[in-house]
Amino acid sequence: MTDGGRVVVAGAGLAGFRAVTELRERGFTGQITLIGAETRPPYDRPPLSKKVLTDDGVDPSLQADFGALDVDFRSGEAATGMDAQTLATDRDKYPYDRLILATGAVPVALPGPGRQRFLRNYDDALALRALFRPGLRLAIVGAG
């Protein structure tokens, strides 16, 4: 797929980031738009549960030069729907010739009472870190 055209990538996590870099590395010359719901640039998620929870100075951002890649990066826009030709977000509509869905998953809340927190994104990690204190008791569900 080296010809022109418009590719829209919904999801600016590692999979979306890798999709746009791979397209360019394989010679795709068309328009690429990368859309992410988070306001941050793409970042690596594994450090969220390791370094970000314990260290203020960690930046898990992927080194992305969207200008050099000629990628239109739209942050803070959540995909809300699509049809065969257009991806809709909470801000705009993006026509495409090819669509890559790389939105990932959402956490599932467990039934029952109790305070549940999720570790899905950078802001979740910061919120959890703020709750940590000596003697805190917690249960961790999931090993993703």
List where the protein language model places each region.
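Conserved phosphate-binding and hydrolysis motifs of nucleotide-dependent enzymes
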Residues: 11-16, 104, 142-144
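FAD-binding core/adjacent interface of flavoenzyme oxidoreductases
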Residues: 1-4, 64-141
